Amino acid sequence: GIAPMPVQRPIPVWFGGASVPAYQRMGRLADGWFPQVPPGERLDEARAVVDAAAVEAGRDPTAIAMEGRVSWNAGGLDTVVDHAGRWRAAGASHIAVNTMSAGFASVDEHIDALTAAAGALGVTPPR
């Protein structure tokens, strides 16, 4: 089993995928989704399929969360903030920041970068 159990009831189910059938499934069933494309025309097309499937299933498309992903790279914090802004403009409700390719040598460097990103993006700790 899962321990400790998540506090959310029911447990949120998030889907990822990059095909029309996957997008339709997300619209029918998912609490959230992980797009496999960046903001732009392809994301807009995917979102339209998710939204249409949600409506067809009697669901509110705006209730389906979306997580955008940004990577900390040579552009550093400025790039993270720029890319997160693009995801927000595209409707992302969540942003994941990946520091694994940043070239950091220690865990503390990753934590410092994520702390800086959280501050720059206006993220507050959960309560």
What are these regions (language model features)?
Residues G1-R127:
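Active-site-adjacent structural elements that line small-molecule/cofactor binding pockets in enzymes
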